[in-house]
């Protein structure tokens, strides 16, 4: 009977000893909850991207600005998954909404005959970009923000726009813009 009990307990003891000898466990997070810190980092990344496009234009002209803008768009927006709900500040008529990567690129750097009114918002001589959030909503792997973005140019002039973004967190942790609405504040 004692021998039988020992045989029942021995595998449990061996299992316990085996677990103690293992390295740290592999952890898999099964939710994609986006955090406020990730959203703010994505907004700061967007501002940094805009300033990089502006600096690229100043130092290397249109070709360098376009290549930089392509990288910024590919990193920050979710066009690779389908249409993005993008309404730029200075767009109107049939070209108000930019569901495609090409439409976003034209807005940021201009130079696309399919978008003749675009002069390149991001190639202006921007020196700073700052986000002020009024609302941040976090919902699983998505987040919405609403507030203002202020841009300062080389002459020190500040332009402030009303900005609404929606962000998506991919399974690998990458945060991408799926909605971007920008407009000038009402003056009345």
Language model region names:
Residues 1-10:
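Bacterial N-terminal signal peptides that target proteins for export
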Residues 138-146, 150, 154-188:
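Short beta-strand edge/turn micro-motifs at domain boundaries
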Residues 23-79:
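Short, low-complexity N-terminal intrinsically disordered segments enriched in polar/charged residues
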Residues 9-18:
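Bacterial N-terminal signal peptides
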Residues 3-4, 21, 25:
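N-terminal leader/targeting segments
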Residues 40, 60-134:
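A solvent-exposed, acidic/Ser-Thr-rich amphipathic alpha-helical stretch
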């Amino acid at each position: 009977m004692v021998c039988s009990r020992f045989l029942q307990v021995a595998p449990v003891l061996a299992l316990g000893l085996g677990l103690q000898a293992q390295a740290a466990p592999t952890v898999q997070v099964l939710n994609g909850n986006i955090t406020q810190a990730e959203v703010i980092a994505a907004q700061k990344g967007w501002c940094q991207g805009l300033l990089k496009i502006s600096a690229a234009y100043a130092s290397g002209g249109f070709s360098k600005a376009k290549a930089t803008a392509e990288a910024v768009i590919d990193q920050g927006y979710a066009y690779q998954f389908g249409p993005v709900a993008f309404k730029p500040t200075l767009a109107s008529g049939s070209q108000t909404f930019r569901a495609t990567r090409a439409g976003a690129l034209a807005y940021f750097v201009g130079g696309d005959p399919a978008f003749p009114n675009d002069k390149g918002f991001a190639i202006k001589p921007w020196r700073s970009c700052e986000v002020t959030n009024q609302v941040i909503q976090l919902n699983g792997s998505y987040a919405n923000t609403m507030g203002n973005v202020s841009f300062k140019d080389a002459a020190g002039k500040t332009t402030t726009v009303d900005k609404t973004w929606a962000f998506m967190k991919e399974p690998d942790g990458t945060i991408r813009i799926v909605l971007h609405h920008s407009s000038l504040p009402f003056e009345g």
